[in-house]
Design a protein with these regions (language model features):
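Acidic-basic catalytic patches of nuclease active cores, encompassing PD-(D/E)XK
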Residues: 1-43
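Non-catalytic C-terminal interaction segments of nucleic acid-processing enzymes
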Residues: 29, 33, 91, 98-117, ...
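Conserved catalytic cores of phosphodiester-cleaving nucleases, focusing on short active-site segments
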Residues: 31, 49-78
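Short, conserved, surface-exposed binding loops centered on an aromatic residue
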Residues: 40-41, 50, 54-55, 110-112
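Short His-Asn-centered micro-motif
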Residues: 41-43, 63-66, 123-124
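Short acidic/glycine-enriched loop/turn segments that link adjacent beta-strands
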Residues: 43-47, 127-128
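Short connector loops at helix/strand junctions that flank enzyme active sites
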Residues: 44-46, 58-62, 113-117
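Mg2+/Mn2+-dependent nuclease catalytic core
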Residues: 69-109
Length: 181
C-alpha cells in the first residue's frame, strides 16, 4: 500500500514563476471551452482572470498549483488549504462589486453584469485536475495554521490557511485538458 505524506514548504518565488503562467493558460483554455470570454488576464496582483460567460455572468478566477498533488488526490487529504492572505481578494471583490458602473469599467466589462462570482481554483502539478471553490465557501471555511509536529518552528507553519472540506457540496473537482503550449 502506497502511503503519501503531506509536505509543507515555504513560498518559493521560482516555483511561482514556473507554475503561474502555465496554470492561467490551462484555466483560460478550460473557461473558453465553457463559453467564457476572457476580459482581463493581466498580472495586477488581483485575481488572475476575469471572464463573462455567454449567459452574461461575470466571473473572477484565482488559480494556484498544489505541487504535492500528483495524478491522484490522496484520500487522506480531507481538505484543500488556501492561504488566508487570499482574503484580500474576497474583500476586493465585495468592495469593487458594490459600485457596479466603475467596477464594470475597471474590469473591461461592457456594462453592469450580475451575478458576479469569484472562484478559487487549485490545480494539481500536472495541471489536469482542479478543485473549484466559490468565494463564499472559502470565506466560511475554518482558518487555522498547519499542524506539523516535525517542524514546529518552521515559518510557513505560522501562516493561517482556510481549510476547505473536500466533501462540501458547493466545491467540485474536475479533470481538465492539459495545455502544453
Amino acid at each position: 500500500m502506497l502511503i503519501r505524506k503531506h509536505q509543507n514548504r515555504r513560498f518559493n518565488r521560482l516555483s511561482y514563476m514556473a507554475n503561474d503562467g502555465k496554470a492561467k493558460a490551462v484555466l483560460k483554455k478550460y473557461l473558453i471551452s465553457r463559453d467564457h470570454k476572457i476580459t482581463d488576464d493581466k498580472e495586477n496582483f488581483s485575481w488572475d482572470l476575469s471572464t463573462v460567460a455567454d449567459s452574461g455572468c461575470a466571473s473572477f478566477w484565482e488559480v494556484e498549483v498544489k505541487n504535492q498533488w500528483g495524478k491522484v488526490w490522496n484520500d487522506s487529504w480531507k481538505e484543500v488549504r488556501i492561504p488566508q492572505r487570499k482574503q484580500r481578494l474576497i474583500d476586493k471583490f465585495y468592495h469593487e462589486t458594490n459600485n457596479a458602473k466603475e467596477f464594470a469599467q475597471d474590469n473591461n466589462l461592457p456594462e453592469f453584469i450580475k451575478p458576479y462570482q469569484l472562484t478559487f481554483v487549485v490545480l494539481n502539478r500536472h495541471l489536469d485536475q482542479g478543485w473549484f471553490i466559490p468565494h463564499d465557501v472559502l470565506e466560511k471555511s475554518p482558518v487555522q495554521t498547519i499542524q506539523n509536529s516535525r517542524h514546529v518552528d518552521a515559518p510557513h507553519l505560522k501562516e493561517p490557511f482556510f481549510h476547505v472540506d473536500v466533501k462540501h457540496e458547493d466545491i467540485y473537482k474536475l479533470k481538465l485538458d492539459r495545455m502544453d503550449g
